[in-house]
A protein has these predicted regions:
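Mature, structured domains of secreted/extracytosolic soluble proteins
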Residues: 1-247
């Protein structure tokens, strides 16, 4: 796909399983890590690419001068470093495998969107809330959407998206996951409440669209073999299943 220029930033998946970040304000195009002079270079460069082709029937070619770089920070590390209170709550719920630096409910064969509450929001909410371990688990998993990477560029359609929360309609033999209604828009992601009002708007900022990845290699490769598997957005309200538009 190609950028349409509507959002401040657009996220275009490449053939290697990573994302190119298109800044429609500055014109810069980069990978999920800063662009450098030379592969894995120390000098960071910015700037728009130069279009070379104008009449191709299956794409457009650009000259970028420097090397795109792609981060392989894991979802576990990203949440641990940027949302320590949420990370610790996941651990308390028994959902982490700390010895392996991973969450037990995350699969390397799936993609995710995570709406991670900030430390301040969680501290305020938890001050007046007591959770059992089972409730804590359900609460944490409500913030994970599986099967889609939703950015603030409006490329996904509005609809009910499957979370990792085990729904009450599940049985001993069948697991049903709760779904939450999401309206991806231009420079924001909107969540209605159960009455059709506003629950939360997540506006594009430096605290949104943080991309995590998986390193498929040993770490000794000249060219890193990584793919993107999750995007994380900071949220200033916790996700409460009973208050949101869910099914």
């Amino acid at each position: 796909s190609s950028p349409n220029g509507l959002a401040r930033k657009e996220f275009i998946k490449n053939r290697a399983g990573n994302y190119l970040v298109v800044d429609n304000q500055s014109g810069e195009v980069r990978g999920t890590a800063p662009t450098t002079i030379g592969y894995r270079g120390s000098v960071v460069v910015t700037g728009p690419p130069t279009q070379l082709s104008t009449n191709a029937d299956n794409g457009t070619t650009y000259d970028i001068k420097s090397w795109f770089s792609f981060s392989s920070s894991s979802l576990y590390s990203l949440i641990q470093n940027n949302f320590p209170r949420f990370h610790n709550l996941i651990r308390q719920a028994g959902l982490s495998q700390d010895a392996y630096n991973r969450y037990s409910f995350i699969s390397d064969n799936e993609i995710y969107t995570v709406f991670a509450p900030t430390d301040s929001v969680l501290n305020i909410w938890l001050a007046d809330t007591t959770l059992t371990t089972a409730q804590m688990k359900q609460f944490c998993l409500m913030h994970f959407v599986q099967g889609k990477m939703i950015f603030t560029d409006g490329r996904q359609s509005p609809g009910y998206y499957e979370t990792l929360r085990r729904d009450e309609t599940s049985t001993e033999f069948i697991t049903v996951y709760s779904k939450v209604y999401i309206e991806p828009g231009i420079d924001l992601i909107h969540f209605p409440d159960k009455s059709g009002g506003d629950y939360i708007d997540i506006n594009e900022s430096g605290a949104t669209n943080r991309i995590a990845g998986i390193n498929l290699g040993t770490g000794d490769e000249v060219f890193a073999n990584t793919i993107s598997n999750a995007v994380v957005h900071a949220v200033n309200r916790v996700f409460e299943h009973g208050l949101m538009d869910t099914r």
